[in-house]
Amino acid sequence: MDDQDPGGISPLQQMVASGAGAVVTSLFMTPLDVVKVRLQSQRPSATSELTTPSRFWSLSYTKSSSALQSPGKCLLYCNGVLEPLYLCPNGTRCATWFQDPTRFTGTLDAFVKIVRHEGTRTLWSGLPATLVMTVPATAIYFTAYDQLKAFLCGQSLTSDLYAPMVAGALARMGTVTVVSPLELVRTKLQAQHVSYRELASSVQAAVTQGGWRSLWLGWGPTALRDVPFSALYWFNYELVKSWLSGLRPKDQTSVGISFVAGGISGMVAATLTLPFDVVKTQRQMSLGAVEAVRVKPPRVDSTWLLLRRIRAESGTRGLFAGFLPRIIKAAPSCAIMISTYEFGKSFFQRLNQEQPLGR
C-alpha cells in the first residue's frame, strides 16, 4: 500500500504471498484444467462432416510421417488426443484407414480415459508452462489489484463498493496482455499432449505464417473471459467477505471466511464467462495449421462469429462445454488461491508488527 503502517505489508511481500498461492493452486488444480481443455477442444462428432471447411479452423495438421506409406496421406491431430485420423488428399474420407479418436462423454469419462490411455502424468501436462505463467502473472495481478484498489479508494475516484470491480478489471487487463503467449503454449500442451520440440516447431511455423502477432492468438476471447471474470470475482468476493465477516474488522478476516468467499465468487464468475473460455480454447487450438491436405488455413474469425458458429454446430450447450470441470476447478482454485494469499498477508503483517518495516 502507499502509506505503510507497522501492521501493513509491502508490494514485495504481496507478490511473495500471491506467488506462493499460485504454486499451491496449480499443483492441485491442473488436472481439472487439462480435462476442461480436452472437453472444450473436442468437436461435436469425430466422424461427421470432417472435411467441411468450417471444421478445419479448430484442428492442427502435420505432414505425412513414416507411419503413412502411401503418398498423399496425412496424419491429423484431432480432438487433442494424438490419435490418427487419415484423409485422402482430395478431402474424401477413406473408411479403410479411418481410426476414430477417443471421445469423452463427460468429466469423469475424460479422467478415466486420459489416465487409461495416456497415463496419470498426462493430467499434469503443461504444469511447467502453467507455473512459469501463473506464478509471475498472479504475483503481478494480485499486487496490482491491491495497489489499484487502495489508490482508487484513497483518491475517491470511485465508491468503495465499485473500487474492487474497477481495480480487478484493470489489473487483469494488463496481466492478460503480458501472459497471453504463455497461455497459448499451455493450452497447446494440455490439449494435444505434444512434446516441447513439436511445440517449438508449431510456434515457429505460426510466427512464420502470421508474424509475432500470432502468439497473441486468442487474446480477444481471453480478455473477454478474464477481465469480466476478474471484475465480477472481486466485486462479489468483497461483498461476500464483508457479509460473512459481520462486525469483524477487515484486517482480521479469517482464512476460512476468505476460502468460502473466494469459492462462491469464483463459481459465479466462472459460470457467467464460460462461453468466452470455450472460444479462447477453440481459437488457440488452431495454432500451427499447415497445408497437410491442401487446405489453406482460414482467416481468424471474430469472437462473436465463433460464438455463433459454436452455437450453430453444437447448440447452446456447446457454449458451456467443460462447464462441470470449469466450475469444479474455479470454486476450489479461487478458494485456495485467495485463502493462501490472505494467509500470506497475515503472516507478513504479524512479521512486520514484530519487526516494523524499514528496520
UniProtKB/Swiss-Prot annotation:
One family name in Pfam for this protein: Mito_carr
Q: Name one GO biological process term.
A: cellular response to iron ion
Reaction(s) this enzyme catalyzes, per UniProt:
glutathione(in) = glutathione(out)
Give UniProt keywords alphabetically: 2Fe-2S, Heme biosynthesis, Iron, Iron-sulfur, Membrane, Metal-binding, Mitochondrion, Mitochondrion inner membrane, Repeat, Transmembrane, Transmembrane helix, Transport
Q: Name one GO cellular component term.
A: mitochondrial inner membrane
Zinc-finger recorded as keyword: no
What is the stated purpose of this protein?
A: Mitochondrial transporter required for glutathione import into mitochondria. Glutathione, which plays key roles in oxidative metabolism, is produced exclusively in the cytosol and is imported in many organelles. Mitochondrial glutathione is required for the activity and stability of proteins containing iron-sulfur clusters, as well as erythropoiesis.
Q: Which family does it belong to?
A: Belongs to the mitochondrial carrier (TC 2.A.29) family.
The protein depicted here goes by the name: Mitochondrial glutathione transporter SLC25A39
Which species expresses this protein natively?
Answer: Mus musculus (Mouse)
Q: Which taxonomic lineage is given here? A: Eukaryota, Metazoa, Chordata, Craniata, Vertebrata
